[in-house]
């Protein structure tokens, strides 16, 4: 009698161990290294880019460049002014680029790239973000309106009888996004998350107001022919975006032509960056992993933080900090008006604008934000650095007045940063905004228990959540009481 065949056992798979390849040793990167996941291949590169995109990093790099410029200008002023006054003219005279200097290229060309990113952010906020909903946008817009009107009126009241004041009232209307968000991030995770949203919307609206001032009020005669050329080129760029012509070989020459046309038209060419940024799509197509605006923001963020803003700070902050210069800020009407407008005007105007919008039932305070938080918000808005320095160069005709106003901007911004950080870390500002231990994410009160704010999968990428609510927390039930107590 034959025995039944044995049952087949489990199939054993042979595990092949692949030797890790270290660059510079053995065969070098080959086909096995190409099979590594994308995150393993570019972890260092992506991590460094994310480090540069962080708000704290941008603020610290901007601060380091400012300190370097001050040290350079106060220890070797001759060398500083010689370097940045180096002639760097380019092209024929009819392009109006032949008389430019090195500092002009930084303020006009490099800052145009930064304002292109501002245009991308503004387009996203107007379409998908805080400014897309009327009630959500009303609070930061009203706060920004008050924060622009009060500083302008204070500065105008202190300088309207001063000869050479020009358009000095326009200098303290702007808020520096990089510095303000950097100072806010230094306050730690106990600050209410809604305060950052309001500050971002306020800074974007402030920048929009500063851009309109530059475009409409601070130009020196407009050439209609060049303006028509720039308008035609912008229309061509809009058509290219609409037809999905995304090649850099098309868009880079178009952007350069728009910049040259606006510069020749008499409008500050940084407006070209904002206009081009507003034309980029913020909604991805079905076959695109992300929108073009999101991709450009991700690529340009590290360049802005590491190159453009520090270079502008290095070229524009070379002011004297001698006792005579600091005394000049307190005695000169223009410098005093700029400093008072930034520090006191923002502190009064931002809370007043927000209060008026809430009282008129046009807006409401975000969750977790109380009236006491509007005081540090007004102080953060008083950090007017990048755009204020740019407006100073355009608003004041006298170089001596430009140096005095730049010193006033620096002094007021440092004072506003210190006061805002102190106010944000005070117990009054952090009441009602507890933080989770060991985590940098803000916390919220859920049923009287502090816990991290739930995030959906797409929230971490900055995208919409699709209206999905987070899953309810699992509640652990207590075991039933024993019928036979001991």
Curated annotation (Swiss-Prot):
Keywords per UniProt: Antiport, Cell membrane, Ion transport, Membrane, Sodium, Sodium transport, Transmembrane, Transmembrane helix, Transport
GO cellular component terms, semicolon-separated: plasma membrane
Start and end residues of each stretch annotated as Disordered: 432-486
Single GO MF annotation: sodium:proton antiporter activity
Lipid bilayer topology: Multi-pass membrane protein
Transmembrane spans: 58-78, 102-122, 138-158, 168-188, 198-218, 220-240, 260-280, 300-320, 338-358, 374-394, 404-424
GO biological process: regulation of pH
Major location category of this protein: membrane
Catalysed reaction, written as an equation: Na(+)(in) + 2 H(+)(out) = Na(+)(out) + 2 H(+)(in)
Pfam families membership: Na_H_antiport_1 (PF06965)
Subcellular location: Cell membrane
NCBIfam families: NhaA
Protein family: Belongs to the NhaA Na(+)/H(+) (TC 2.A.33) antiporter family.
Function recorded in the entry: Na(+)/H(+) antiporter that extrudes sodium in exchange for external protons.
Protein's name according to its UniProt entry: Na(+)/H(+) antiporter NhaA 2
């Amino acid at each position: 009698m034959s025995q039944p065949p044995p049952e087949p056992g489990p199939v054993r798979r042979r595990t092949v161990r692949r030797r890790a390849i270290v660059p510079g040793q053995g065969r070098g990167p080959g086909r096995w290294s190409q099979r590594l996941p994308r995150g393993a291949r570019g972890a260092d590169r992506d991590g460094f880019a994310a480090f540069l995109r962080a708000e704290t990093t941008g603020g610290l790099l901007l601060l380091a460049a400012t300190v370097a410029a001050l040290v350079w200008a106060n220890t070797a002023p001759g060398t500083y002014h010689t370097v940045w006054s180096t002639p760097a003219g380019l092209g024929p005279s009819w392009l109006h680029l032949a008389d430019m200097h090195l500092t002009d290229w930084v303020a006009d060309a490099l800052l145009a790239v930064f304002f292109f990113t501002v245009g991308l952010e503004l387009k996203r906020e107007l379409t998908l973000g805080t400014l897309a909903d009327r009630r959500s946008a009303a609070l930061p817009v009203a706060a920004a309106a008050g924060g622009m009107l009060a500083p302008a009126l204070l500065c105008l009241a202190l300088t309207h009888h001063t000869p050479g004041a020009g358009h000095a009232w326009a200098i303290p209307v702007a808020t520096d996004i990089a510095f303000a968000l950097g100072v806010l991030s230094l306050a730690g995770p106990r600050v209410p998350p809604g305060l950052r949203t309001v500050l971002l919307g306020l800074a974007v609206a402030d920048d929009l107001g500063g851009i309109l001032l530059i475009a409409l009020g601070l130009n020196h005669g407009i050439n209609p022919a060049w303006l028509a050329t720039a308008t035609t080129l912008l229309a061509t760029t809009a058509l290219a975006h609409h037809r999905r012509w995304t090649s850099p070989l098309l868009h880079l020459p178009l952007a350069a032509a728009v910049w040259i046309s606006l510069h020749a038209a008499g409008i500050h060419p940084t407006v070209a960056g904002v206009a081009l940024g507003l034309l980029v799509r913020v909604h991805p197509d079905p076959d695109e992993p992300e929108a073009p605006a999101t991709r450009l923001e991700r690529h340009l963020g590290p360049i802005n933080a590491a190159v453009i803003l520090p270079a502008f700070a290095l070229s524009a902050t070379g002011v004297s900090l001698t006792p005579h210069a600091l005394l000049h800020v307190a005695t000169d009407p223009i410098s005093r008006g700029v400093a008072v407008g930034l520090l006191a005007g923002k502190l009064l105007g931002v809370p007043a604008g927000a209060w008026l919008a809430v009282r008129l039932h046009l807006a409401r305070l975000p969750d977790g934000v109380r009236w006491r938080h509007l005081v540090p918000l007004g102080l953060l808005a008083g950090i007017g650095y990048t755009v204020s320095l740019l407006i100073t160069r355009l608003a004041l005709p006298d170089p001596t007045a430009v140096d005095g106003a730049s010193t006033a901007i620096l002094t007021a911004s440092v004072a506003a940063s210190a006061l805002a950080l102190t106010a944000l870390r005070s117990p009054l500002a952090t009441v009602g905004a507890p933080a989770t231990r060991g985590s940098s994410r803000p916390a919220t009160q859920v049923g009287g228990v502090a816990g991290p704010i739930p995030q959906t999968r797409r929230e971490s990428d900055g995208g919409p959540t699709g209206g999905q609510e987070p899953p309810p927390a699992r509640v652990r039930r207590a075991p039933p009481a024993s019928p036979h107590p001991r």
